[in-house]
Amino acid sequence: MKKTLYVSDLDGTLLSPAPEITEHTAEVINALTAKGEYFTFATARSIYSAIPITGRLDINVPCILMNGVSIYDIRNKRYLKTEFIPVEASAEVLKAFERNNVRCFMYKLEDETLVCYYSELNTKVMRSFAESRKNDYKKPFVQVDWLADHANGDAIYYTTTGPHDVLYPVKCAVEKIEGVDYAFYLDVYNGEWYLEVFSAKASKFNGIKFLREEFGFDEVVAFGDNLNDLSMFEAADVKIAVGNAKDELKAAADIVIGCNDGDGVAEWLSSAVMNNR
């Protein structure tokens, strides 16, 4: 019998529009893992927002965080793998933001603790992001005068959110920097765009490749909705897009299922996996 890993994106895919894990989704996934199947998630979220929002799920395989930057073992509360941004590349990334007068958050992994640095919160969206993370998830935020003074080799992620036309020039500059990759996509909740910059070695593709090799999976079934899930699809044997997915992802999918507002992932798992075991 094949050893299969089921891995789902969170926002827009496994999570409802609320966003939350519905009772039905929790019941299906927990029944799945109780029967010996393997389930995890791959997300752009960090540990601080991903772990609480999936708390009702029995995740039995380490998860992929921050678009593949880190592999985190939820059960044993430890990072298995993290891709750091080279110092020279970090300096160039910060210059790209500065030249375009765009502020960003810088994430660093310090003694197994994820810390978020920023210089100023100069937009309503950035202030809202910081306040929600501080209040809802108790994420450590540190304000400094210059991010460049603290980009000393343990930076793993740069992120910001705003209008497409404001972030696009930064994206164009970042894509020319050696040693980093990026994700640039529309947020499913507020209509703003996200720009996320990370090591060129980090991706959902490489995250799934690591899990496949580390745990000996014969097959990977992946669920997604957005452009940052394309690399995950490349690593999967079966590619499944939810009904609300971007057209580009649907075009790359083997199967299109129900939308996230109708527990599409759980419904498919229930009918295609649980009923056939």
PLM regions and their residue ranges:
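Active-site phosphate-binding/coordination module
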Residues: 20-129
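Asp-based phosphoryl-transfer active-site loop
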Residues: 3-19, 93, 233
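Mg2+-dependent phosphoryl-transfer enzymes with acidic/Ser/Thr/Gly-rich catalytic loops
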Residues: 1-5, 22, 194-277
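Short, structured coil segments at secondary-structure junctions
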Residues: 57-59, 67, 177-178, 235-236, ...
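Surface-exposed amphipathic alpha-helices with a cationic face
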Residues: 26-34, 98, 175, 209-213, ...
